[in-house]
Design a protein with these regions (language model features):
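Phosphate/diphosphate-binding loops
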Residues: 228-262, 343-350, 389-409
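Histidine/acidic-residue-rich catalytic or RNA/ligand-binding cores of hydrolases
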Residues: 152, 214-216, 323-331, 377-384, ...
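Acidic (Asp/Glu)-rich catalytic clusters
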Residues: 221-224, 250-256, 339, 360-362
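Non-cysteine beta-strand/loop elements that form the S-adenosyl-L-methionine
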Residues: 71, 256-276, 365-375
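Divalent metal-binding segments
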Residues: 4-11, 16, 20-246, 271-318, ...
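Short beta-alpha connecting loops at secondary-structure transitions
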Residues: 78-85, 340-343, 348, 379-393, ...
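Short acidic/histidine-rich active-site segments
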Residues: 272-275, 311-321, 368-371, 404-421
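Flexible glycine/proline-rich, aromatic-decorated loop/lid segments
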Residues: 280-282, 365-404, 421
Length: 421
């Protein structure tokens, strides 16, 4: 029997395997879902009359990227319900709502997206929604999800308001749209297409609590071989505490190549700029270490429970105080030969102490980093914020990616999609 031939042969002047430092000219031979060979010649030994040869020239060929923190559930909010972009008056806004209500056979929450809060004067609009729809919830999200317009019925039903319009606050609406097949089927297909178009083939996906039934959707798509995005999903306790039994069920349910349960995820503190970051030393000119309360004992209990049951835990920590406490929590977890048995991770690490980075490197904590986050705000604004909150001396440890690597940590890249898209 002769050597197996390729279904596809990709030739490029720039092939990056990630196992060598620089790209090189050559080929990649592919059969089915398997890479047969990678080489620096023309790959002709792998070709027969059935092989499709792709001459890619200057185009880069690289392994698929892994995005270690994505949030499809939040991405979908950009497209939920009525498209309210382009609305320029309260009259248009109310007319759109009215038209949607008249279309629906059964009374349900009216959702909308794309609203521009600065597009027209909104004073009195909430009262008009209350009068017109006293028995029906109405929620229209701003184009950037920073706020929303909603009536009293919606606030009562879902337990949040326009001043607290963020995913953890509006988690009660998620079961509705995640189980709306007419909406979620095309939405997830577009999401996979978007990620694939950026070279992403695998994601670590955030799902609140028990994912509100969305795991059944993923299972169905996996069995039908309709997934182009490998999905390792996590449970983030929001409406309830850690649900270990759910994790056990998901671990048993997903054993294939495309979907797996990856463990648990939780926030600790907030950003340093907002003074919600937990600091080892007080904020400049104050006696305050953190403007919010963080329940570290509860977090430690959850991490220990997850660790005992063979699950990993990702903790978000932004201030150096939070990073220090997270390092201490992980240091108490199971180890073998000095390294963590379960691959726990710390996310973001906006501001950190080099000693804690070294400690985490020694025990094998992975860093999940939003590498693009430095591009969100103008450089001068960031510098000013650092000077005002922690000062220039401590500021040299802000976004200390070099220190993380020098400390021995393995770093992975995340977009926190939809934040970075």
């Amino acid at each position: 029997m002769g050597k197996q031939k390729a279904d596809y042969l990709l030739r490029s002047d720039h092939i990056f395997t990630s196992t060598v430092e620089n790209p090189f000219a050559g080929y990649v031979a592919v059969s089915g879902q398997n890479i047969l060979a990678v080489g620096t010649d023309d790959g002709s030994d792998w070709i027969d009359e059935q092989t499709e040869v792709l001459e890619l020239g200057d185009q880069l060929v690289t392994p698929g990227f892994i995005d270690v923190h994505t949030f499809f559930t939040g991405y979908a909010i950009f497209h939920i319900g009525i498209d309210m972009s382009g609305i320029t008056s309260q009259e248009e806004f109310l007319q759109k709502i009215k038209e949607q209500v008249e279309k629906e056979k059964e009374p349900s929450t009216v959702f909308g997206h794309g609203w521009n809060p600065n597009g027209f004067e909104t004073e009195g609009l909430e009262e008009k929604l209350n009068e017109a729809y006293s028995d029906r919830a109405v929620i229209v999200f701003a184009a950037d999800r920073s706020t929303c317009m909603m009536n009293r019925k919606a606030e009562e039903a879902y337990g949040f308001n326009p001043k607290e319009c963020y995913p953890e606050a509006y988690h009660k609406i998620m079961p509705e749209y995640l189980n709306d097949r007419d909406f979620i089927e095309p939405e997830f297909k577009d999401y996979m297409k978007l990620m694939n178009s950026r070279g992403v083939t695998t994601v670590k996906e955030m799902g609140f609590d028990d994912f509100y039934g969305f795991d059944s959707f993923l299972k169905e798509k996996e069995e039908k071989k309709e997934l182009s995005l490998r999905t390792f999903f996590m449970s983030q306790p929001v409406g309830e505490g850690i649900n270990i039994e759910h994790g056990k069920r998901m671990r048993e349910k997903f054993q294939g190549d495309f979907v797996r349960f990856s463990g648990y995820n939780r926030m600790t503190d907030g950003t340093v700029a907002s003074t919600k970051g937990d600091l080892l030393e007080p904020y400049e000119g104050t006696n305050m270490h953190c403007s919010i309360q963080v329940d570290y004992p509860m977090i430690e209990k959850e991490v220990q429970l997850a660790d005992e049951n063979g699950f990993r835990y990702s903790l978000h920590a932004q201030g150096d105080g939070a990073v220090h406490k997270v390092a201490g929590i992980f240091d108490k977890c199971q180890k073998k030969d000095g390294k963590l048995v379960n691959r726990h991770a710390v996310t973001d690490m906006e501001f950190s102490n080099p000693a804690d980075l070294k400690k985490m490197g020694e025990i094998g904590v992975t860093g999940e980093i939003y590498f693009q986050i430095m591009s969100l705000d103008p450089a001068d604004d960031v510098k000013k914020s650092i000077e005002e909150t922690i000062g220039t001396e401590r500021g040299k440890y802000f976004w200390n990616r070099r220190g993380m690597l020098d400390g021995g940590m393995t770093l992975s890249g995340a977009t926190d999609l939809p934040l970075m898209i």
